[in-house]
Amino acid sequence: MQDIRNIAVIAHVDHGKTTLVDKMMLAGKLFRDGQDNSGEVLDSNDLERERGITILSKNVSINWKGTKINILDTPGHSDFGGEVERVLNMADGCLLLVDAFEGPMPQTRFVLQKALQLGLKPIVVVNKVDKPNCRPEEVYEMVFDLMCDLDATEDQLDFPVVYGSAKNGWMGEDYNKPTDNIDYLLDKIIEVIPAPKQLEGTPQLLITSLDYSSYTGRIAVGRVHRGTLKDGMNVTICHRDGTQEKTKIKELHTFEGMGHKKTDHVDSGDICAVIGLEKFEIGDTICDYENPEPLPPIAVDEPTMSMLFTINDSPFFGKEGKFCTSRHIQERLNKELEKNLALRVQPYEDTTDKWIVSGRGVLHLSVLIETMRREGYELQVGQPQVIYKEIDGVKCEPVEELTINVPEEFASKMIDMVTRRKGDMTSMLNMGERVDIEFDIPSRGIIGLRTNVLTASQGEAIMAHRFKEYQPYKGEISRRSNGSMIALETGTAFAYAIDKLQDRGKFFIDPGEEVYGGEVVGEHVHDNDLVVNVTKAKQLTNVRASGSDDKARVIPKTVMSLEECLEYIREDEYVEVTPKSMRMRKIELDHLKRKRSNKD
């Protein structure tokens, strides 16, 4: 029997989690010394590298002094809560990584709370102690207070602390005495984290994630809860709904470094990949052939936000994407459902080309849209809507805990902005020159808040939010106050026309771009919509007096990210998403029809 430790890494975005895991892999000799390791091995998805966040959870294992350490990477965002809960089910202990300057952040709370409820033993790593102005002692106190708040047990509160800098590759027990490697941390993991319990009996494995290989099809990944799984043995899959299916394991793989390694048996406590099964979902149990005993399935938080997805029916349909039809989008959404636990998809009112897609928040859904866009899909999405529930006859809506960290002089602005959106301030902490303000705010109020907060604080604010609970409906919230500027007809936008219209508002297009009638090309300074003709060229005739010819000076366009577009649009607008561009448009492109329907 090999000695095993299963450990989950918990950290806030950008606190150095992935870097630390990379260094652990170096220590476990997973890279040859000359091999290029361009940083972030775990954030292998392009989107993750660009945004600097972890979305999917990954498994890696290293060998340290004869013990196999399985390292599980968890996402830090509460939008990906479904991912977090799956991973923690496989671990026996957790590594809580905090920044020596910032201390524990709101999202860390979310994952830590789940970990402590599952009874995992924590090791606290205070990272980035080489930063100027860091305060490791205070941060340690903050972590201790946080654990007390989250009802940690006596045993969990007696946690070891390791100080160090993952970037510079050292860890030790005193932050004033840098060492030259991270051995201290690895030794602590083996000493403090309990080995998985060896349970004898019939085999049980709860499927906690899926892998896919074009060669063998779908692969089930999970931790052997009890007994031993063998290569080629007959097993029963118990589905979540109680049905059972007999099948056979073709191959078993364990995780070795970054890849898989074929093996003939896996003992309880180890994490493995099972190949050759068909028809299984996350949360199913693989159990004994003769007398199956399923494990309880994973409970995942319900979605709080939904969006309308539909096919692209704009005049520029099919010019840029490979997959544009409803069949393509339907297949892609079904594929996403297999591995994305917190997602729900329903057809919209008996139509075949519209779907209501629900998820954990704007970020969760925008990552899905962005991934589809990069794969060559064209689609349109509507304004994000909050999912209401009726509890004891009262209409309730999701409320989130919002934390904003800003320099002191902007604090009053922030409080004003959030309270206008029906937020209640719960606490305010002064941390040197910055303040930490906490609010309870309806999820509706968060849509579109980030852009305003960043503008009002000159880009200084750090904002994080997580779902708290459902509370009674708080009343109307005023949304964007400016109207849209809408293109009159299809054609190429000219600098001459844009220049003459610049006093009407700011534009989202550059001269030379193709536009179509009904596309939203800018933001009007007033609250009504304005139809403008940006395709009007200058008449080159001799009729007018020469000489009064001024050069057009066009202010550069406002560039918006996908999240900003989703938060910006109104209910009568769509965001059109194609692999090369993102446009906003009115749902009804025809101006006369739009006018008529407004009169009704």
Which residues are covered by each model-predicted region?
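P-loop NTPase switch module centered on the Walker A-proximal segment
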Residues: 1-104, 142, 210-213
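Interdomain boundary/hinge elements
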Residues: 36-42, 150-162, 196-206, 242-255, ...
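Canonical P-loop GTPase G-domain recognition
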Residues: 121, 131-191
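Short glycine/threonine-rich beta-strand-turn micro-motifs
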Residues: 165, 349-364
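Conserved nucleotide-binding/hydrolysis modules and their immediate coupling elements
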Residues: 204-307, 317-319, 482, 491-541, ...
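Helix N-cap motif at beta-to-alpha junctions
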Residues: 228, 278-279, 359-365, 407-411, ...
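Long insertion/accessory domains within large nucleic-acid-processing enzymes
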Residues: 255, 260-263, 396, 441, ...
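A short, contiguous, amphipathic alpha-helix enriched in charged residues
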Residues: 314-337, 551, 555
